[in-house]
Regions:
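Catalytic-loop of the protein kinase fold
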Residues: 150-167, 172
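AlphaC helix of the protein kinase catalytic domain
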Residues: 120-130
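Activation segment signature within eukaryotic-like protein kinase domains
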Residues: 138-139
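AlphaC helix of the eukaryotic protein kinase fold
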Residues: 78-90
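Conserved short submotifs of the Hanks-type protein kinase catalytic core
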Residues: 106-119
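Conserved activation segment of eukaryotic-like protein kinases, specifically the C-terminal portion
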Residues: 199-212
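Activation-segment/catalytic-loop signature of the eukaryotic protein kinase fold
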Residues: 102
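Protein kinase glycine-rich loop
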Residues: 41-47, 52
Length: 307
């Protein structure tokens, strides 16, 4: 008599795990949400949570496709995509990278945004780079973006030179020749509401604000974490080079000390934005913009100012 093997219970059979499939160069992908089709190009960037590809839509717009990495389960990636899209749509602003579309294709999540020419980080590689030439134009756009985030109760938490971009806007009458330079704040993936702020949300270890390193000494985390980060970026532009600080240097106030050595009006504006104690730091983006237009306050005042 032939022994019968036990048959599996269909209810116990799990469906195959969904796998994200990256796009290939030249592939045309259509969004069911908008009907727009995107011809995929080369990989142009990569972050903690996504890979970015160049692409063009049917209107010949130069765009970027952020493809979310399959970190965690399909459900977790979908939740992350939905959260980021919600923020991008809610926080649409001329000084924040613009979102065009979002969709799922082959169990892979795409977020389509405008394509920027390069990050501010790449500007530092220009030969004989003079950051002071760029400081005020970048500050004007960046601070407007930060102001818009804050009045909508969001904090970016991760502002640095790789997350601020130069965008080239073409002249429709002379698209190959004339282009206007604009600056945009991007990567809102880790942005949080005011009541969701946590020390663990700040990603870049080299730019952790003092209040993250020692909240008992320097104060609680609030929206002024963005002011500190903007201050660090503008300090880099003022010195025309990338700067990195150890936690010990941040706690000792080295960024502020470097700001004090600058010429007016930068020394007053940036030393105030880079104060270690949150309660003495620049209150908001508008105040920092006004400080950048304030005449010299005097070296003695700066040296005696709260740190």
């Amino acid at each position: 008599m032939t022994e019968q093997l036990p048959q599996p219970n269909p209810q116990n059979i799990l469906p195959p795990a969904k796998m994200a499939i990256p796009p290939s160069i030249g592939e045309v992908i259509t969004s069911m949400a908008t009907g727009n089709s995107y011809t995929m190009g080369e990989k142009i960037g990569e972050g903690n949570f996504g890979v970015v590809y160049s692409c063009k839509d049917i209107w010949e717009n130069d765009l970027a496709a952020k493809v979310l990495k399959p970190i965690g389960t399909y459900e977790n990636v979908k939740a992350s995509a939905t959260e980021e899209l919600t923020k991008l749509v809610h926080l649409r602003n001329p000084h924040i990278t613009f979102v065009y579309d979002a969709f799922e294709f082959r169990d892979t999540f795409y977020i389509i945004t405008e394509r920027c020419y390069c990050s501010v980080k790449q500007l530092f590689s220009i030969q004989n780079f003079n950051g002071l030439t760029w400081l005020m134009p970048i500050a004007r756009s960046l601070l407007q973006a930060v102001h818009y985030l804050h009045i909508n109760n969001y904090v970016h938490q991760d502002i640095h030179s790789a997350n601020v971009f130069t965008a080239l806007v073409k002249d429709e009458m002379m698209p190959q020749d004339n282009k206007i330079v604009q600056f945009k704040l991007g990567d809102l993936g880790v942005a949080k509401l005011f009541n969701e702020l946590d020390a663990k949300n700040t990603r870049a270890q080299w730019m952790l604000p003092p209040e993250v390193l020692n909240p008992n000494e320097f104060g609680a985390i609030d929206r002024r974490i963005d002011i500190y980060h903007v201050g660090l970026l503008l300090l880099e532009l003022a010195y025309s080079k990338e700067l990195r600080f150890t936690p010990e240097e941040i706690i000792s106030g080295k960024p502020r000390e470097m700001a004090v050595q600058l010429q007016p009006p930068y020394h007053f504006a940036l030393e105030k934005a880079l104060r270690r104690h949150v309660s003495y730091r620049t209150a908001d983006a508008m105040e920092l913009w006004r400080d950048l237009h304030t005449p010299s306050q005097g070296t003695v005042v700066l040296l005696n100012a709260p740190k």
